[in-house]
């Protein structure tokens, strides 16, 4: 499937809200609050000492939980009500339905009795939390769909639930993801069909949120003109560009001017692909820093790689 173009947003400038004001960047090594063992961002229980934990995203730290809560100098935090589906973020007692900001950004999800789809949802929600942490690192505004028209939201749907095709894409702030792509065999089949070098859920999210931020960050004519100088005129027909891309492919020597073959299709996709690959690179460097990998700047044996 191909990605839908996003609709051009209005000229209303949006401002950041509390959900994007995070503390230390995620590159700081996450550790168990009890035994200080390195843990992963999706950890619910420390594999070393058994401490139940949750992430307090404002200060970007894991804290120990007792009976699903923790109390400190900044008050009491509670486990997100979606913890049974893998969410380890914490909330205040006034959080709507006890759900964290990441879970509340999901506008549409499978029905509660669709347990198979909900298992897929848990994997996609994990990737979404990683995305939001990274967006917070960059200081980008996160304005929810339920507070502002055109705000950020996610429709997480499964094409396996009712047989209807789900088109991955972005429109007016809402990012749509097909939960079926959380299955490795489904995602790999699509990757091979489209001739892509790799295909991941987190990659989809990073790409589609690039469409969202193109509208959020570029508001005035001068900035749009600079954007068009770099990426091309986004007012060109998307449908014609889509048809041409899948008929003839990327131009020769595309590597000289574009980050990926898909970026050659249309200026919208060039921006979104560039945004996504920037997040790929930053995420790789953050992971390297967290686990202690060091690069030798003087090494001469490094070769060009496909990022």
Question: What function would you assign to each model-found segment?
Answer:
Residues 1-25:
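N-terminal amphipathic/basic-hydrophobic helices that include classical n-h-c signal peptides
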Residues 37, 263-307:
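Pan-zinc metallopeptidase signature
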Residues 125-184:
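Auxiliary, metal-adjacent structural segments of Zn-dependent hydrolase domains
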Residues 136, 140, 214-222, 276-284:
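Hydrophobic/aromatic-lined pockets within catalytic cores
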Residues 195, 215-246:
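Post-HEXXH active-site segment of zinc metalloproteases
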Residues 199-219, 272:
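Active-site recognition of the HExxH zinc-binding catalytic motif
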């Amino acid at each position: 499937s191909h990605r839908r173009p996003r609709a051009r947003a209005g000229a209303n400038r949006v401002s950041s809200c509390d959900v994007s004001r995070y503390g230390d960047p995620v590159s700081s090594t996450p550790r168990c609050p009890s035994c200080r063992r390195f843990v992963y961002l999706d950890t619910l229980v420390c594999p070393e000492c058994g401490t139940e934990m949750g992430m307090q995203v404002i200060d970007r730290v894991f804290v120990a939980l007792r009976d699903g809560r923790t109390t400190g100098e900044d008050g009491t935090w509670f486990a997100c009500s979606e913890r049974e589906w893998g969410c380890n973020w914490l909330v205040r007692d006034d959080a709507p339905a006890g759900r964290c900001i990441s879970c509340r950004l999901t506008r549409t999800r499978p029905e509660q009795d669709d347990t198979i789809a909900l298992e897929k949802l848990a994997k996609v929600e994990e990737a979404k939390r990683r995305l939001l942490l990274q967006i917070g690192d960059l200081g980008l505004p996160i304005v929810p769909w339920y507070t502002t028209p055109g705000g950020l939201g996610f429709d997480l749907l499964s094409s396996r639930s009712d047989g209807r095709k789900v088109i991955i894409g972005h429109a007016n702030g809402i990012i749509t993801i097909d939960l079926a792509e959380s299955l490795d065999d489904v995602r790999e089949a699509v990757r091979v069909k489209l001739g892509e070098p790799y295909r991941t859920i987190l990659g989809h999210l990073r790409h589609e949120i690039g469409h969202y931020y193109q509208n959020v960050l570029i508001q005035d004519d001068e900035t749009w003109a600079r954007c068009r100088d770099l990426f091309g005129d986004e007012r060109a027909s998307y449908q014609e560009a889509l048809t041409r891309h899948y008929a003839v492919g990327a131009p020769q020597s595309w590597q000289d001017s574009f980050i990926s073959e898909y970026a050659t299709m249309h200026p919208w996709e060039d921006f979104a692909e560039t945004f996504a690959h920037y997040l790929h690179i930053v995420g790789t460097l953050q992971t390297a820093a967290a686990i202690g990998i060091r690069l030798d700047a003087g090494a001469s044996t490094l070769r060009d790689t496909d990022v």
